[in-house]
Amino acid sequence: MALPGARARGWAAAARAAQRRRRVENAGGSPSPEPAGRRAALYVHWPYCEKRCSYCNFNKYIPRRLEEAAMQKCLVTEAQTLLRLSGVQRVESVFFGGGTPSLASPHTVAAVLEAVAQAAHLPADLEVTLEANPTSAPGSRLAEFGAAGVNRLSIGLQSLDDTELRLLGRTHSACDALRTLAEARRLFPGRVSVDLMLGLPAQQVGPWLGQLQELLHHCDDHLSLYQLSLERGTALFAQVQRGALPAPDPELAAEMYQRGRAVLREAGFHQYEVSNFARNGALSTHNWTYWQCGQYLGVGPGAHGRFMPQGAGGHTREARIQTLEPDNWMKEVMLFGHGTRKRVPLGRLELLEEVLALGLRTDVGITHQHWQQFEPQLTLWDVFGANKEVQELLERGLLQLDHRGLRCSWEGLAVLDSLLLTLLPQLQEAWQQRTPSPVPGG
């Protein structure tokens, strides 16, 4: 397949060559020379699906008719506009999510990447991820996405049980999933991630562990475990509400998660985030930006972003949400160059709350250096060092606070939500009192 432009062809070839030379061995790769405010990840939302899954409440639509050329033009325009408004000079990763972006034309993916390459620097080892569903991504189509510049796939496998797949409203079978996974690994060796869900109605620990063991015979170097969340407004929620299905058992889900983590550790996977496991250094660079509270631009209907617009003097980060409905979003992009519906300036405390809640999702946690990038006056020791409730969490081995920073233990990662019930109020209280003290041993 031909790409729409020689620059995109050259960039895709360079990316593939760099990918052969080396793998990303740590989160974020080599330090970038640009200041943090000039760097960002880019998320591109494709809002369309073949059908709505029974558990999903994401911003997605079943198109009655689709003029992809118009959608492509608007995605390109909004990407260019947001890059200009943000002053971002280096894009460190691109993630095509949805919806089902594997339903988009590879030409659309190539056009977006070409536009971004014209507006910002793209490193040769740029991670470009595409979410794919097995039924919308036969091998020939995956190869075309590779030619367009995609070098990493995230496959929504969800289950290897056909009964569970039907319950979830998925359009693929377990055989479809494994066939697509095998083809993806052939085309993108070492760069394929799969999702596996747990905590479904009537799901039992033993059969689910059997699925995980089976998946280990087929998967690549990245795997995500996600617990089902029953969302109001979904078909699955309604079935549980009216008693047609049993409510998921949270204790069984917790056991699945704990035993699943142990199985993956024995298989050589490193848990680098609450839901994510990797081996051979195959971490998700794009998602790492989220967990480290880096800047990211959200392009497409309903996309979310976090960046400092140039008009704000480059000092106030904003949370941004694009217009949800695709037709309205396209009208706004054609009129204004972007479809931003909501802008919320983030105060310093709000930003620190995000740094805390997101950073503790990772095994690295929050280093002192990283914290000081967001709050140079109030240290982690100031906030958490003398609090009795936090000390109890440290003594129970759920948290660690030392010369490296603040992080969860292996046991603590599994109960992070409960830890944040203590940590976030303590941060808020310390912020109100703000009386920095010397660092122990400093």
Curated annotation (Swiss-Prot):
Extra remark beyond the main annotation: Might carry two S-adenosyl-L-methionine binding sites with only one binding to the iron-sulfur cluster.
Name of this chain's protein: Radical S-adenosyl methionine domain-containing protein 1, mitochondrial
Coiled coil ranges: none
Positions with a binding annotation for S-adenosyl-L-methionine 2: G99, T100, Q158, R170, D195
Subcellular location: Mitochondrion
Gene it is expressed from: RSAD1
Organism: Homo sapiens (Human)
GO molecular function: 4 iron, 4 sulfur cluster binding; coproporphyrinogen oxidase activity; heme binding; metal ion binding
Membrane-spanning intervals of the chain: none
